[in-house]
């Protein structure tokens, strides 16, 4: 079990309190699909992903990005039991969707870049430490079924 300080909890909650889920979700997922094009293979049913412009304009990608952010909201609300909170989602991604678990880390990195850009100077070292810890726990929980 991960131990969270009051400061870490406050930082994570503050980040989520200011997030525009639609904007940040869309930007994070599109960034991941563009920067790491091999991740596109999991989104074949989402239509044309031919180039960066079509990915950025794809409403299904935008909607899925929003869904991902709402999924992170579940982790926020269950910070003391993220592993069990994501057990079913981990099973889905491993057994049914066959997602390479390294892609969770890539998406987390893209999400960090987008949030840091949005927050600017407010994304301090302490903020990044707490945020990276949170995402590391989420990524580990999502990859649980692969171990």
From Swiss-Prot:
**Which molecular-function annotation in GO is an example for this chain?**
haptoglobin binding
A single Gene Ontology CC annotation of this entry is: haptoglobin-hemoglobin complex
Q: Which residues cross the membrane?
A: none
A single GO BP:
hydrogen peroxide catabolic process
Q: Which UniProt keywords apply?
A: Heme, Iron, Metal-binding, Oxygen transport, Transport
- As recorded in UniProt, coiled-coil segments are none
Please state every residue range assigned to the domain named Globin: 3-147
Locate the residues binding heme b: 64, 93
In terms of Gene3D superfamilies, this protein maps to: Globins
Provide the tissue specificity.
Red blood cells.
Please state which protein family the record places this protein in.
Belongs to the globin family.
Functional description taken from the UniProt entry: Involved in oxygen transport from gills to the various peripheral tissues.
Any further remark recorded for this protein: Hb 3 displays a Bohr effect, which is enhanced by organophosphates, and a Root effect.
Q: Oligomeric state and partners?
A: Hb 3 is a heterotetramer of two alpha-2 and two beta-2 chains.
Q: Write down what this protein is called.
A: Hemoglobin subunit beta-2
């Amino acid at each position: 079990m991960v131990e969270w300080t009051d400061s870490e909890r406050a930082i994570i909650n503050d980040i989520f309190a200011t997030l525009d889920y639609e904007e940040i979700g869309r930007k994070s997922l599109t960034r991941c699909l563009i920067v790491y094009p091999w991740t596109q293979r999991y989104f074949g049913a989402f239509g044309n992903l031919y180039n960066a412009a079509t990915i950025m304009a794809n409403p299904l990608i935008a909607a899925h990005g929003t869904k991902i952010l709402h999924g992170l909201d579940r982790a926020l609300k269950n910070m003391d039991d993220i592993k069990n909170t994501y057990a079913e989602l981990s099973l889905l991604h491993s057994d049914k969707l066959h997602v390479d678990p390294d892609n969770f880390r890539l998406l987390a990195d893209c999400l960090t870049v987008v949030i840091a850009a949005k927050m600017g100077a407010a994304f301090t070292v302490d903020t990044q430490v707490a945020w990276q810890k949170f995402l590391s726990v989420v990524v580990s929980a999502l990859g649980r079924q692969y171990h």
